[in-house]
């Protein structure tokens, strides 16, 4: 891995403002315990895939090397989501939420269909600048709809949005349906209710329906 230093270019309006914005992001592991995301000053990131090839690098990450790049292994629609987010005029930085539950990851507890507890790590946290100049954080979670735990994870995110939505600018769950990325806006109470009540086998039905819209 290579040592990544905290990225402060383009995001320094007050000292540590972006990191502080993340520190205010709270998550629910088991109610009523709320925990903050622990963002360290430095991060060690892998720069090669398991096979030895170099990982592609991306700009705009909260942590970056001296050249402003961060290595990440993203699939095609994660890349598409990242490109869409980075092109927004309000975009400041992005954070790849660690895939494993660590103090540096946003973790949301969920129960699967067998009532076993698991931990949902959403994909991206995106920092943006609000119209009043303050920084805010969004949860942007592109994911597959083919895993057995997709529905309980979506429902956990909907429940989390119900409890903590006011901490975030946006909370969006994204799935690819055919060739089109579709998004559920979990700030919307009606969409949350639809997700919470859904008991079908294929979560993609939610993203194909009228509650979802094309992600762009």
Q: Where would I find each of the regions flagged by the language model?
A:
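Electrostatic, structured charged patches in enzyme active sites and in nucleic-acid/phosphate-binding
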Residues: 1-216
């Amino acid at each position: 891995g290579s040592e990544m230093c905290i990225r402060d270019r383009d995001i320094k309006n007050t000292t540590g403002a972006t990191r502080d914005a993340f520190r205010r992001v709270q998550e629910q592991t088991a109610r009523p315990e709320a925990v903050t995301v622990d963002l360290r000053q430095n991060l060690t990131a892998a720069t090669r895939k398991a096979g030895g090839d170099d990982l592609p690098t991306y700009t705009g990450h909260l942590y970056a090397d001296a050249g402003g790049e961060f290595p990440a292994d993203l699939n095609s629609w994660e890349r598409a989501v990242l490109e869409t987010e980075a092109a927004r005029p309000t975009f400041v930085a992005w954070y790849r939420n660690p895939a494993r539950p660590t103090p540096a990851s946003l973790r949301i507890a969920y129960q699967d269909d067998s009532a076993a507890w698991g931990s949902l790590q959403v994909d991206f946290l995106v920092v943006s600048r609000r119209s009043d100049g303050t920084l805010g954080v969004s949860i942007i979670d592109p994911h597959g709809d083919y895993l057995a735990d997709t529905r309980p994870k979506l429902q956990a995110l909907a429940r989390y949005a119900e409890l903590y939505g006011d901490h975030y600018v946006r909370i969006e769950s994204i799935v690819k349906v055919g060739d089109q990325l579709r998004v559920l806006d979990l700030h919307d109470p009606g969409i949350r209710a639809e997700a919470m009540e859904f008991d079908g086998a294929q979560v993609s039905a939610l993203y194909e329906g009228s509650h979802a819209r094309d992600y762009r």
